[in-house]
């Protein structure tokens, strides 16, 4: 029997305890806050672990890390990035291409905390209506950004990039960034469920393409154990990725292979029947 969205995870907490039902959420928040702290430790305490912001940085003043989308924009705009930027982009692309689908979105992006809060409040308030927006729109926006940069010769996305703006806001003050975050929060809360991350964000679209063949995947252990409580669907920011592995035909894979999965592990947390686990794309046991 399907549970109400506002009670998602309750059965898991009652059966296995709070830690089991929230462990991946806890580790994700710790990861996001730790990375943010590494950026802020320099400006606030003079300890430069990550120098820069989410668009581009230096780890320990040695290892370059560059946002692949910004790098692609630069190339499209015919502004050849320096060697350090290209190396940094290559490191990021290789890391996420191997590690897991959209791991940046679920484990690094600070904006994920804002959109997750909107999704949680939406469930608690029982808001069910949502605007019908194609999930493919984000890929269209990604293409338009690159085309726009090519035509204009400018890095158009950096004018409005809320992820980079949020990182800078903790140092320079929120100002207009605070209003931008409020708009995204209210959009997700009142207009479209998972509207920003699930339908519009071109950064997530870029990481989806990068991690399309990545190693780490969510796997359904045993479809027969599913009791159709719908808790996993209610908490998943990309619920469509669960349909085939969980309720697909017998010959369909038990792995969540969609590039839209953000590898957050919330489906594992909230499932009282322990239907899901983290595995690799090469795990075909049970099929």
Curated annotation (Swiss-Prot):
UniProt-annotated binding residues for [4Fe-4S] cluster 1: 226, 229, 232, 236
Residues on Cytoplasmic side: 1-29, 101-139, 192-287
GO molecular function annotations of the record: 4 iron, 4 sulfur cluster binding; metal ion binding
Disulfide bonds: none
Any single Pfam family the record assigns to this protein: Fer4_7
4Fe-4S ferredoxin-type domain ranges (all copies): 217-247, 252-281
Biological function: Required for electron transfer from ubiquinol, via NapC, to the periplasmic nitrate reductase NapAB complex.
Protein name: Ferredoxin-type protein NapH
Organism expressing this protein natively: Haemophilus influenzae (strain ATCC 51907 / DSM 11121 / KW20 / Rd)
Highest classification ranks of the organism: Bacteria, Pseudomonadati, Pseudomonadota, Gammaproteobacteria, Pasteurellales
Gene: napH
